């Protein structure tokens, strides 16, 4: 198998999804790709102080600065792209901003009329620690916020909302190194985009941003025809994961749970009229529901079945 490397340049980055964008790299199933991505908004130079304006890859900017698209030979609608995340190494700096928008949440929290907070982080990937300009330190757990394919429909599509069709801005903190994300293929060649590095993030991404940072990611890309679960799903060091995306958090929860119940019926070899109800009963004892993010208008919930939770 071949190893490829992809750097972020004006020719290899985009800020919208489109099936019409020509691939910047074509690979075979099983190939390894080392992808370097800028931070979410595409800073070309690091900030020296919180909130400092620096040149961006795209001005004006329409969405996340993503590296790609990557064509995978043999990936066609009806197949699934397996993205195996071998390693993720954040850059040496990152930023976080909160209460920057006047929306229902900032109004509910009494923050809409006050000043926002902007933090600048020094990131030590070797030690796995980030320290911000206020002196707070957090453990790093790097992952990519955006791993996605363009929608099947033509035209340009925002990178902001995660989609059941193609994934994208999933923002799931579970997708660390050692995980495999399974994306049903939406367009010929898959046209994978990667970016939006997060050095650390809590469930919910409650402030609207994580520790946003450049990232170097090593992936192995493969094409499978018989996925273990419906829709977008993952196997991570923590367990099996299914996702739901919807502006209504209740609907997002139901989507994630429904996909997990289908997966559990197969895992537990359940059959009969009560198979799904039995899966729900077992999930109630051994599974988890977590709010992925409330930052992207289309909210996310993921269901988690931890490894070894069921004997």
At which residue positions do the language-model features occur?
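Short, Lys/Arg- and Gly-enriched loop/turn segments at beta-strand edges
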Residues: 40-51, 88-98, 189-199, 292-295
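Intrinsically disordered, low-complexity linker/loop segments enriched in Gly/Pro
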Residues: 87-177
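Short, structured beta-strand/loop micro-motifs enriched in basic residues and often containing a Trp
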Residues: 8-18, 59-67, 158-166
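A generic structural signal for residues embedded in beta-strands
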Residues: 35, 80-83, 183
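N-terminal, Lys/Arg-enriched amphipathic/low-complexity engagement segments
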Residues: 1-58
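Conserved mixed alpha/beta catalytic, RNA-binding, or beta-rich assembly cores of soluble enzyme
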Residues: 140-169, 173-250
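A hydrophobic, small-residue-rich beta->alpha segment in the mid-to-C-terminal subdomain
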Residues: 227-282
């Amino acid at each position: 198998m071949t190893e490829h490397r992809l750097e972020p340049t004006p020719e290899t980055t985009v800020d919208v999804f489109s099936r019409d964008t020509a691939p910047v790299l074509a690979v075979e199933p099983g190939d390894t790709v080392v992808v370097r991505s800028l931070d979410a908004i595409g800073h070309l130079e690091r900030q020296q102080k919180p909130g400092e304006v620096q040149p961006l890859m795209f001005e004006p900017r329409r969405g996340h600065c993503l590296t790609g698209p990557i064509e995978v030979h043999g990936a066609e609608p009806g197949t699934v792209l397996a993205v195996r995340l071998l390693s993720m190494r954040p850059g040496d700096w990152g930023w976080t901003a909160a209460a920057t928008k006047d929306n229902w949440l900032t109004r509910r929290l009494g923050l809409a009329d006050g000043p926002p907070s902007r933090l600048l982080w020094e990131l030590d990937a070797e030690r796995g620690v980030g320290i911000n300009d206020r002196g707070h330190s957090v453990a790093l757990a790097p992952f990519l916020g955006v791993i996605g394919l363009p929608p099947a429909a033509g035209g340009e599509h925002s990178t902001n909302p995660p989609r059941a069709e193609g994934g994208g801005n999933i923002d799931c903190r579970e997708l660390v190194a050692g995980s495999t994300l399974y994306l049903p293929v939406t367009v010929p060649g898959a046209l994978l985009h990667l970016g939006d590095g997060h050095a650390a993030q809590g469930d919910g991404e409650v402030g609207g941003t994580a520790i946003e940072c450049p990232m170097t990611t090593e992936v192995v890309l493969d094409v499978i025809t018989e996925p273990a679960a419906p829709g977008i799903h993952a196997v991570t060091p923590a367990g099996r994961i299914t996702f739901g995306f919807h502006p209504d958090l209740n609907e997002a929860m139901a989507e994630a749970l429904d996909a997990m119940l289908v997966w559990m019926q197969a895992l537990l070899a359940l059959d009969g009229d009560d198979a799904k109800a039995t899966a729900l009963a077992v999930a109630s004892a051994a599974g988890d529901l977590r709010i992925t993010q409330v930052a992207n208008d289309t909210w996310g919930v993921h269901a988690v079945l931890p490894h070894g939770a069921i004997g």
